[in-house]
């Protein structure tokens, strides 16, 4: 009880808002959502196909991040921004540092780079 979650794929704030409105939730548990830029990814793939570059993307897995474009992100609309001490301006500045390469994000899926977790993982809440 009284937990919080991060939605995935699309802005899921509406689930919490609707849950509060209909009485399912006592509060909105969604802090934010880790969104995929599906529109951007599809447009990029279609542009590659239109340009005749199908062989570059056929039978492959795409791995799109901020360094490549707006392929991932957080919802920044005022009604979805639920952070109390992290502003949208700070978020946009952080995104720019990732895009420019000033901050590097490890995109590896190698087991040696994955964090070790178990059912005994401790989560520290910062208020």
Regions found by a protein language model. Give the residues of each.
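A residue-level marker of the well-folded mature domains of exported/periplasmic proteins
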Residues: 1-127
């Amino acid at each position: 009880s009284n937990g919080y979650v991060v939605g995935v794929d699309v802005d899921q704030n509406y689930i919490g808002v609707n849950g509060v409105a209909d009485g399912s939730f006592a509060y909105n548990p969604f802090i934010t959502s880790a969104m995929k830029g599906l529109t951007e990814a599809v447009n990029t793939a279609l542009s590659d196909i239109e340009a005749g570059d199908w062989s570059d993307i056929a039978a492959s897995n795409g791995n799109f991040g901020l360094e490549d474009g707006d392929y991932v992100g957080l919802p920044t609309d005022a009604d979805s921004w639920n952070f109390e001490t992290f502003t949208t301006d700070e978020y946009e500045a952080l995104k720019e540092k990732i895009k420019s390469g000033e901050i590097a994000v490890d995109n590896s899926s190698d087991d040696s780079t994955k964090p070790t977790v178990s059912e005994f993982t401790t989560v520290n809440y910062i208020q």
